[in-house]
Amino acid sequence: MLRTCLLLFAVFLGFTQLSAQPLVKISGKVTNETGHALPQVTVAILGQSQSTITDALGVYHIYSKSKSFTLKYTFLGYNPVQINIKQDKAGRIIQDVVLSINPNELEQVTITNKQNQLSNTVTINISDLASMPSVSGNFEAILKTMPGVSPNNELSAQYSVRGGSFDENLIYVNDVEISRPVLVRNAQQEGLSFINSDLLSSAKFSAGGFEARYGDKLSSVLDVKYDKPDSSTAILNAGLLGLAFSSKIVTTNSYLLAGIRYKNNSGVLGKQDNKGVYTPNFTDVQLVYNYNLSPEFSVNVLGNFNSGVFRLIPESRETEFGTLNSKVRLDVDYDGEEKDNYQTTGGAVALKFIPRSNYVLKWINSYFNTDEKEHLDVGAWYRFNKAGAGFGSGNTESRIGRYTNYAMNLLTSKTFSSELKSDQTFSSHTFSWGLRYERKDYNDDLNESYKIEQEGVLVDNKDSFYQGNNISIQNKLAIQYYTAYVQDSYGLSATTNLQLGLRGSYNDLSKEFLLSPRLLLAYRPARNNKIFRFTTGVYQQAPDYRSVRDFNGMLNLNQKAQRAYNTSAGLDYAFDGLGTRLKFSSEVYFKYLDRLIPYMMDNVRLKYLAADEAKGYTYGADFSVGGEFVKDLLSYFRVSFMSAKQDVKNDGLGYLKRPTDQRVNFSAYFQDRLLNSPTYKVHLSLLYGSQLPVGSPLAARYSDDFHIPAYKRADIGFSKDFLDDFSIKKPVFLDKYFSSFTAYVEVFNLLNINNTVSYLWLKDADNVQYAVPNYLTSRRLNLKLVLKFKNSK
């Protein structure tokens, strides 16, 4: 199927190139206003799928298939030029062009914006979201190409930043903090994350050293803002994995954003080693309504309904693992089924008051209710087939066993928050403050059991803290949080800026008063193409239900806040190279954690050792470089190095690797146009994450002597925009109703690499333990259409 579709796509591309012999040869030189040659300028003939680029001397040659045509010259940072040419007969012509600088476009690739200078954040290019090939379809897929983020699971919206856990990341949508489900144990159960990419106007991400205005987590912050449209429009995204529709409606004093998304990735999940009937259905509905009562006062309402139903009737499994000379195959026959339900409803109301042009006051109130139901009743007969070099030749021995996995878990969580915050700008200062109250209520009914038998003999699993034989417990917990912050950003000189902030917090669980000072110093030399940053601060994460619930379901109500001391130094440098404007960013960091709650990680499920306490440290460096090698298509490359270790107090083992100790991470997102057909584009995503430490649940609880292999993945997409600016002969019907009509062909996991996400730990009758790899998704073809309807005033 995949080979046939790719062949058809290649034939289609080839067919579009069929044409008559060239009639006109155009040559010339492209220079700037001072007469200097401009290399790498794109020269295209609109409507003919012909394009080229200028050489190092600014010279180009191109052929036209007709005698009447339009030439278009484009180069990043310069105004585009179009020239209409009409020839009476075939031949050769000389056409020299002078491009003028576009200062507005140059501003987009400089780093002198003061807001970015005073914030240790990276602005995410949201125009990449629709084009980036992603099997999950969630916004968070783009985060895994960000500096400091470790990739290890393409199905999950969860992410680890600089050695931190999934629970250490802050997410804000329109200043409302968003939480994630608690019970999810496998990424295939995850549905649609909260963020609707079609409604976005901006997104910023910080991998550490963020401002005092943001909340009390240890690792990162993602700050997302939804659009404030000035005209009405709609977007339809339809593909093999789901459907999404969003609408933006603008009236005189208000606007409405509406988005509905549906996802069903059964075609992806069905190709895993676990064969069976997969029925995943995920739906998300969001509404944002903003009304301007007056020029000074407005009200903004956000509503959300998110539902996920995951059902699996497993049938069989066949997994081969081991070395080339000592292979083992696990064969499994299943009975039973799994059915999980996740539902979140809620919203927020924000009142915004602007009494003066330099003063903004916001009052934000939110409430979310999440119901999670996990029903798992699966049994499995399994057989190990072992052999040496003759594996598969019949020289095998078999051992039969059975394991059963049961869970009936119900969790209801309710979160209410109210926050008052203000920003006021003076001549050289921006002063901010905020007050926040939050209450979280949890009602948890936890029932789990797991057992293994070999040839009718029950394996004693009483020493397994990780799986647990039987858990049956009911918990109720309410936690109240009180926080406040002040922050001042001001210019010490024309080249130096300082930001000082202080957070204070109290919670009625640990009953601690916490103070977290933070500092950011930025220096911009007079040349205006560099920024040096230094940040230092204290980050404290108060206990919540996830961290106080031990692996056996018991609650440690005496747990104290986790605390990290973070220091980093970085450089942003913008320069011209490779025919475009490039931005290089680097940052080195050190994070010492004197109070840390250890945990074990299995897929996306974290099991905290809530009764224990640890200390740890993380250090590393992030590097990235990016630019528009082709106009309007941003490409970037990044590499990160890191070491993360922890020492659990009183265990006598000293420092061991943290579960997130991924030493090397690399990512690349590269985009290009086909040289002779610029309306066709290619989008390539590459991810690499080195091995992760893991230990057997039946061994010492802090063991890290085993590893999950390195994560390696390549996804590629091909797109064709039928209304691209490079095409002058646009389909009349499409041009009448749509501003963009783009078709995508995507290949997920292009190299079909088996990436391991976790292990199934089993023993045979000889008490030999096996770590059976649980593989992630294999190669998969996807087709989709993204339609953007024309704006209506």
Residue ranges of predicted features:
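Short, acidic, small-residue-rich periplasmic hinge/interaction motif at the N-terminus
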Residues: K29-H36, V41-L46, K72-Y78, D88-P133, ...
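Face-selective signature of the C-terminal outer-membrane beta-barrel domain
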Residues: N292-G308, G336-S510, S585-V588, Y636
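Gram-negative outer-membrane beta-barrel transporters
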Residues: L492-T495, F590-Y592, A611-S696, V786
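Predominantly transmembrane beta-strands of Gram-negative outer membrane beta-barrel pores used
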Residues: L170, S202-A212, S219-D227, T233-V277, ...
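Periplasmic N-terminal accessory/gating domains of Gram-negative outer-membrane beta-barrel systems
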Residues: N79, K86-I93, Q115-F210, V221, ...
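Membrane-embedded beta-barrel scaffold of Gram-negative outer-membrane proteins
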Residues: K362-S366, R524-A526, A561-Y619, E628, ...
